[in-house]
């Protein structure tokens, strides 16, 4: 889909039982979730500086500037790495930390394409993306607390208690934070909570 939109995507590295995989290159989303649901040691990494620099240099052979849209700086160190690397490109690479991830990050990419089509330059696009970064919220729920504990998002004691009570946490992502939003006893209840929250957000955002 990225190719059809004229985009260039850096694949996200995953470590599974000590072996590195690249998203959508030698590991499909289906395979990733199969490993995640099984008893495997799964963790994420970030694209190497060499991979990032090689892509930028290749793009600048064809384009005047690059707008790089990484994951939120609060959720991944890949943003800070990109900003440090961009310092050596004299403004030709603009790294937009617009505090988004997943579907909202994709929305930012589409917004950047629209702004480029309207004639805005890379610096202006980057500035606008950062100004509007907090305009969206993601709600998620998880079936297991294992990876929240592993990533340090919750304490081992909280994970043990939540597992014992079979709680399904509803989490919210806005800006740099992954926060607890609510606790549900079933996935059905968790989904209902998320739908209610999204509906309320839409009503508040478009109440005019």
What are these regions (language model features)?
Residues 44, 68, 95:
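Short catalytic-loop micro-motif centered on adjacent basic/acidic residues
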Residues 37, 57-64, 87-90:
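Generic short alpha-helical segment signal, independent of protein family or function
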Residues 1-51:
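N-terminal glycine-rich anion-binding loop in soluble enzyme alpha/beta folds
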Residues 34-39, 56, 113-115:
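A general structural signal for short secondary-structure boundary/capping elements
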Residues 1-19, 65, 74-94, 100-208:
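Mixed-charge interfacial surface used for oligomerization/domain docking
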Residues 27-32, 61, 83-88:
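A short glycine/small-residue-enriched secondary-structure motif
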Residues 29-32, 49-52, 82, 109, ...:
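A general structural signal for well-ordered alpha-helical segments in protein cores
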Residues 51-79:
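N-terminal glycine-rich phosphate/adenylate-binding segment common to multiple enzyme folds
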């Amino acid at each position: 889909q990225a190719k059809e939109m004229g985009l260039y995507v850096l694949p996200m590295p995953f470590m599974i039982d000590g072996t590195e995989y690249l998203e959508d290159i030698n590991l499909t989303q289906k395979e990733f979730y199969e490993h995640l649901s099984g008893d495997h040691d799964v963790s994420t990494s970030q694209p190497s500086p060499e991979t990032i620099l090689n892509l930028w240099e290749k793009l600048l052979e064809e384009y005047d500037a690059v707008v790089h849209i990484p994951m939120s700086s609060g959720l991944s160190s890949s943003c800070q790495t990109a900003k440090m690397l961009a310092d050596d490109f004299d403004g030709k690479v603009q790294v937009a930390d617009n505090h988004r991830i997943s579907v909202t990050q994709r929305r930012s990419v589409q917004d950047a394409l629209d702004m480029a089509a309207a004639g805005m330059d890379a610096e202006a696009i980057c500035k606008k993306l950062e100004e509007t970064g907090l305009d969206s919220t993601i709600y998620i729920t998880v079936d297991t607390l294992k990876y929240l504990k592993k990533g340090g998002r919750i304490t081992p004691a909280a994970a043990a208690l939540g597992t014992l009570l079979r709680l399904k946490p509803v989490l919210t992502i806005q800006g740099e934070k992954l926060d607890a939003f609510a606790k549900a006893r079933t996935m059905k209840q968790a989904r209902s909570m998320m739908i209610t929250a999204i509906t309320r957000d839409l009503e508040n955002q478009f109440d005019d």
